[in-house]
UniProtKB/Swiss-Prot annotation:
GO terms for molecular function: ATP binding; ATP hydrolysis activity; ATP-dependent DNA damage sensor activity; mismatched DNA binding. This protein is involved in the repair of mismatches in DNA. It is required for dam-dependent methyl-directed DNA mismatch repair. May act as a 'molecular matchmaker', a protein that promotes the formation of a stable complex between two or more DNA-binding proteins in an ATP-dependent manner without itself being part of a final effector complex. The keyword DNA repair applies. Keywords: DNA damage, DNA repair. The gene is mutL. The keyword Ligase does not apply. It comes from Chlorobium limicola (strain DSM 245 / NBRC 103803 / 6330). One of its GO terms (biological process) is mismatch repair. Gene3D superfamilies: 3.30.230.10, Histidine kinase-like ATPase, C-terminal domain (3.30.565.10), MutL, C-terminal domain, dimerisation subdomain (3.30.1540.20), MutL, C-terminal domain, regulatory subdomain (3.30.1370.100). This is DNA mismatch repair protein MutL.
């Protein structure tokens, strides 16, 4: 007698359901995709007990005749494909013909459907995958599917479901991702008989504001890019918009929601140092690609895809997002928010004033570009033009040598590329802009406690942390110098000797080539001793020994804790140790030079470690604080 036997369909469907139907949200996703594929222009979602008691999806799509209605609950019965080659032209969301068979096998399943020309709807009821009832009833055009008592006959699976709050969150995220992708569809959702939303208008921003909070969409950057291989459109958000996690990164391929590590990493890298540790920026990005160039049949829930040429996709996706990030003003606004105090204690007005604290929040309103913020500063902080013309890279002070990439490229024959092309374009917008709008003859720039630089802008003030601003300037300059391999060193009149401990000398040996590229001219003097004979232009004479020692220590610390790339690590260590410090008094010329050099950088809004460089305090905020509104 044979030991191997063919499993009955009811058993096979239950096993298959383990892959396709992992939780109530899986059912919702599959049923919604079927409704969309059926051409629905109106979809209603009804949930009870987090999907354990009831999941009902109602659509006004094309409906089905009796033959199709019976076949749709059979395994591997589908109208989407008939031969393997059909996968190369597939644009529908569903195609395998597994979902309804799996769902009906682990629930009390009811399907009601009517085509436009039929006087009555067809109703089919299944118990554990077996047809229990068939009848004709009255009903609207389209299809209604009800899934009751999910996993009633698989108690082990039902036992492992999470709390209602967790399961409903997953359901809500499934509905959210599809309602955002298909804004042309009218969506309505109920939870335990309470209406959550009813989206009548195809306004994607209205939906974003509902899902993420009032005015959320006002802080988004729109992206649109297209070539013969790939199209990209959608939105990305400011760093720190809410406390985001990667569930708020929505990637779509041909309007199919997917999870893709490469796209997520490229997005993260495009934001770079603008993000703090464990931050993930918001994104809702739609990629359009020839379906023959992407395989959607690699995951049971169709959440993952495989690109024919992943490198080409990344090589287009990354610079598009990075360019959008660099073009916009990411400086946070400051708001003064009173502490709530201890419950049960009254706070007197004077105590309330003393207990105000400076907080960061994302200010709603149209996103400003870097160019606009810099132009605003020049118009309202600087006096009327006196004939001298300055760009953001042209001023010099005691601590800030000029950053002149255009002249450097001309002299050295270096072709600008990547970020430098963008920087050049940005600088061309700043140049020759000495507006008289600011009025007066005195620059409206001040230093506060030898720590912060305050500048007047059109509708308020801009506050700059002088240390991290200079750190950003030095960081980008150090990376540029090392990557171009054109050392710029100034020789010391009196070389300095530095004796190193064993670990310091080992680190020095590891980074000595890049130290040379950076501008340090160093010579071995024997017995772990090094002579400093030349230093970078940005290093002040007399500080070279301390800076080199601090750089080596900082490099070692970063290598062990952050595991940074070698040159990035060195540039961070160099800029942090060499930047002007809080408490250092600056002249007006030095402050202007620092601001000009800051706005010549690629990312002026955060230091290399992710801290903010610029904060804006707007007049309307001050007016509210003084009771003027």
């Amino acid at each position: 007698m044979a030991k191997i036997s063919r499993l009955p369909d009811t058993v096979a469907n239950k096993i298959s359901a383990g892959e396709v139907v992992q939780r109530p949200a899986s059912v919702v996703k599959e049923l919604l995709e079927n409704a969309i594929d059926a051409g629905a222009s109106r979809i209603t979602v009804m949930i009870k007990d987090a999907g354990k008691e009831l999941i009902r999806i109602i659509d006004n799509g094309t409906g089905m005749n009796r033959e199709d209605a019976l076949l749709c609950v059979e395994r591997f019965a589908t109208s989407k494909i008939s031969v393997v080659d059909d996968l190369d032209t597939l644009m529908s969301l569903g195609f395998r013909g597994e979902a309804l068979a799996s769902i009906s096998s682990v629930s009390h399943f009811e399907l009601k459907t009517r085509q436009a020309f039929s006087p009555l709807a067809l109703k089919f009821r299944y118990e554990g995958g077996a047809l229990a009832e068939e009848s004709e009833v009255s009903g609207e055009e389209g299809t209604s599917i009800s899934v009751r008592n999910l996993f009633y006959n698989v108690p082990a699976r039902r036992k492992f479901l999470k709390s209602n709050a967790t399961e409903f969150r997953h359901i809500f995220e499934s509905v959210r991702s599809l309602s955002l992708a298909y804004a042309d569809i009218e969506w309505r959702m109920y939870n335990d008989d309470e209406e959550l939303f009813h989206f009548r208008n195809p306004d994607i921003r209205e939906r974003l504001n509902y899902y993420y909070g009032s005015d959320f969409s006002e802080g988004l950057i729109s992206i649109t890019e297209e070539n013969d291989y790939l199209s990209i459109h959608g939105f990305i958000g400011k760093p720190g918009m809410l406390k985001r996690h990667k569930a708020d990164q929505l990637f779509y391929i041909n309007r199919r929601i997917i999870q893709n590590r490469m796209l997520s990493q490229a997005l993260q890298q495009a934001y770079g140092e603008l993000l703090e540790d464990r931050q993930a920026p918001f994104a809702m990005l739609f990629l359009g690609i020839d379906p023959s160039r992407v395989d959607v049949n690699v995951h049971p829930a169709k959440l993952e895809v495989k690109f024919e040429d992943e490198r080409s996709v990344r090589n287009m996706f990354y610079p598009v997002v990075k360019r959008a990030v660099q073009l916009h003003d990411f400086s946070p606004d400051a708001s003064f928010v009173p502490d709530q105090g201890v419950q049960g204690e009254s706070i007197q007005p004077e105590d309330e004033a003393l207990n105000r604290r400076l907080m960061y929040h994302e200010r709603p309103g149209r996103m400003a570009t870097t160019a606009e913020l810099y132009t605003d500063y020049r118009q309202h902080s600087l006096p009327q033009s006196s004939g001298k013309e300055h760009g953001p890279q042209s001023r010099q002070g005691e601590f800030f040598s000029a950053h002149e990439p255009l002249e450097r490229w001309k002299k050295e024959g270096v072709e600008p590329e990547g970020d430098e092309v963008f920087t050049t374009m940005l600088q061309s917008r700043f140049h020759d802009d000495e507006s008289a709008a600011g009025g007066g003859t005195e620059p409206k720039i001040w230093q506060l406690h030898n720590k912060y630089i305050i500048c007047q802008i059109k509708n308020g003030m801009m506050i700059i942390d002088q240390h991290v601003a200079h750190e950003r300037v030095l960081y980008e300059r150090a990376l540029d110098v090392m990557n171009q391999n054109v050392p710029n060193s100034q020789q010391l009149l009196f070389p300095q000797k530095i004796e190193m401990r064993q670990w310091e000398y080992e680190v020095f040996e590891e980074i000595r080539d890049d130290l040379y590229r950076l501008g340090f001219n160093l010579r071995d003097f024997g017995s772990k001793t090094v002579m400093i004979e030349g230093i970078p232009q940005d290093v002040r004479s007399g500080t070279e020994v301390t800076i080199l020692q601090d750089m080596i220590a900082g490099y070692q610390e970063n290598a062990s804790k952050l595991k940074l790339e070698k040159r990035d690590n060195l540039a961070k260590s160099y800029s942090c140790r060499n930047a002007i410090m809080a408490g250092q008094k600056l002249s007006l010329e030095e402050m202007r030079s620092l601001i000009d050099n800051l706005f010549a950088t690629r990312v002026p809004y955060s230091c290399p470690h992710g801290r903010p460089v610029i904060i804006k305090l707007m007049l309307d905020q001050l007016d509210r604080m003084f009771g003027r509104t």
